[in-house]
C-alpha cells in the first residue's frame, strides 16, 4: 500500500563534505567509490542508531530527518558525526571535513517520484531553509536550537547575522 503524504514536524538535517569535489579529482574512481560508500555506511549507521532516517544521498550530501520528539538525539548524532567523519576522512588521507546544518519545521513527507519508482522524500520550505544555513561545522537554525534541551543548548553559541547557532568549537565566519 502506498505511503500517504502528510505534513510532518521534523528536524531536517543536511550534511556534506568540504572540498569533496577537489579531493575526488585526485583519486581514481575505485578509491572514490570506496570512500563515498564508507561515508554512506558511517552516516547511515549513526543516523539509524539515533532514531533518524536517511531521506537521500546526493553525492557527498545527505538529507536526514528526525521526528519532533527526537531533536536532541538528532543533534547529538550530528555532533558525533562531525567528529567521526572528520576522523574517517583524515585516516583515508582526504582533506574533507563534515558540515552539518539542521532546522526544525514542517515539511510534506511521503512518496515522490516517477510512476513505478516513487521513494520517501520530504518537500518544503524547512528543507530549503536547512540547506541555506551558513556555517562551517555544525549549525542550527533558531527554530532547531529552541527545541533543544538545556544541557545540549550549552554546546552552541549564537552567531549573527542571520541568527544561527554553531558549536562552541567552530570559528565564526565573517563575510
Report the location of each language-model feature:
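Catalytic NTP-binding/metal-coordinating core of nucleotidyl cyclase/transferase enzymes
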Residues: 2-73
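A general secondary-structure junction signal
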Residues: 58, 100-106, 142-146
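Catalytic-core segments of nucleotide cyclases and related cyclic-nucleotide turnover enzymes
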Residues: 109-134
Amino acid at each position: 500500500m502506498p505511503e500517504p503524504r502528510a505534513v510532518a514536524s521534523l528536524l531536517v538535517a543536511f550534511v556534506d563534505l568540504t572540498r569533496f569535489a577537489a579531493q575526488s579529482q585526485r583519486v581514481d574512481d575505485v578509491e572514490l567509490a570506496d570512500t563515498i560508500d564508507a561515508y554512506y555506511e558511517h552516516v547511515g549507521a549513526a543516523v539509524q542508531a539515533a532514531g533518524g532516517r536517511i531521506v537521500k544521498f546526493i553525492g557527498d550530501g545527505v538529507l536526514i530527518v528526525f521526528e519532533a520528539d527526537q531533536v536532541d538525539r538528532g543533534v547529538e548524532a550530528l555532533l558525533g558525526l562531525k567528529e567521526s567523519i572528520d576522523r574517517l576522512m583524515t585516516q583515508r588521507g582526504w582533506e574533507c571535513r563534515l558540515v552539518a546544518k539542521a532546522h526544525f519545521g514542517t515539511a510534506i513527507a511521503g512518496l515522490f517520484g516517477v510512476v513505478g519508482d516513487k521513494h520517501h522524500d520530504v518537500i518544503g520550505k524547512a528543507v530549503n531553509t536547512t540547506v541555506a544555513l551558513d556555517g562551517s561545522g555544525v549549525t542550527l537554525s533558531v527554530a532547531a536550537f529552541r527545541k533543544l534541551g538545556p544541557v545540549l543548548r550549552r554546546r552552541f553559541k549564537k552567531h549573527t547575522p542571520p541568527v544561527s547557532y554553531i558549536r562552541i568549537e567552530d570559528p565564526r565566519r565573517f563575510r
